[in-house]
């Protein structure tokens, strides 16, 4: 099973790339994390938030089109479901049992287009706080690693 993080944004600071890479490399080969970046759309007087989200959604859809048809889509959204670490670990186990890859969608500054959120099988949120988009990549990778460590009784997670 592959975990694909599809994130709007590119040219992240080095510390973001380092943090993401650190957790991605800790994952076992059978549960690899891959990052696919999508170019953000610039907001202007002729590009309102809805237009920006639609254009970014088209780019995200292009990435999703390159993935398996059975790929499960999970959208990160401020109104998504809260998961505890143990709940995320259980969900990860369920996804592994069901087979297929999982794509996690991280929107741009204006969020994800409503059509993408509707297409997702699950909406989750990492925090009630507003987080920088680059940091969300690092936090998601860390939480996926932590969830995996729970399933393996690895000492990384001590709760």
Curated annotation (Swiss-Prot):
InterPro entries: Alpha/beta_knot_MTases, RlmH-like, tRNA_m1G_MTases_N. It catalyses: pseudouridine(1915) in 23S rRNA + S-adenosyl-L-methionine = N(3)-methylpseudouridine(1915) in 23S rRNA + S-adenosyl-L-homocysteine + H(+). GO terms for molecular function: rRNA (pseudouridine-N3-)-methyltransferase activity. It is found in: Cytoplasm. Its EC number is 2.1.1.177. Keywords: Cytoplasm, Methyltransferase, rRNA processing, S-adenosyl-L-methionine, Transferase. Homodimer. This is Ribosomal RNA large subunit methyltransferase H. It comes from Cupriavidus necator (strain ATCC 17699 / DSM 428 / KCTC 22496 / NCIMB 10442 / H16 / Stanier 337). The lineage of its organism: Bacteria, Pseudomonadati, Pseudomonadota, Betaproteobacteria, Burkholderiales.
């Amino acid at each position: 099973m592959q975990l694909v993080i599809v994130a709007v944004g590119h040219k992240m600071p080095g510390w973001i790339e380092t943090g993401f890479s650190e957790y991605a490399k800790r994952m076992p080969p059978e549960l690899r994390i891959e990052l696919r970046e999508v170019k953000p759309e610039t907001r202007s007087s002729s590009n309102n938030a809805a237009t920006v989200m639609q254009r970014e959604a088209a780019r995200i859809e292009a990435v999703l089109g390159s993935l398996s048809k059975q790929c499960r889509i999970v959208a990160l959204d401020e109104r998504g479901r809260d998961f505890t670490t143990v709940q995320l670990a259980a969900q990860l186990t369920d996804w592994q049992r069901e087979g297929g890859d999982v794509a996690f969608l991280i929107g741009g500054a204006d969020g994800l287009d409503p059509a993408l959120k509707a297409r997702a099988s699950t909406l989750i949120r990492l925090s009630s706080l507003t987080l920088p988009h680059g940091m969300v990549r690092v936090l998601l990778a860390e939480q996926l690693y932590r969830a995996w460590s729970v399933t393996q009784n690895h000492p990384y997670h001590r709760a």
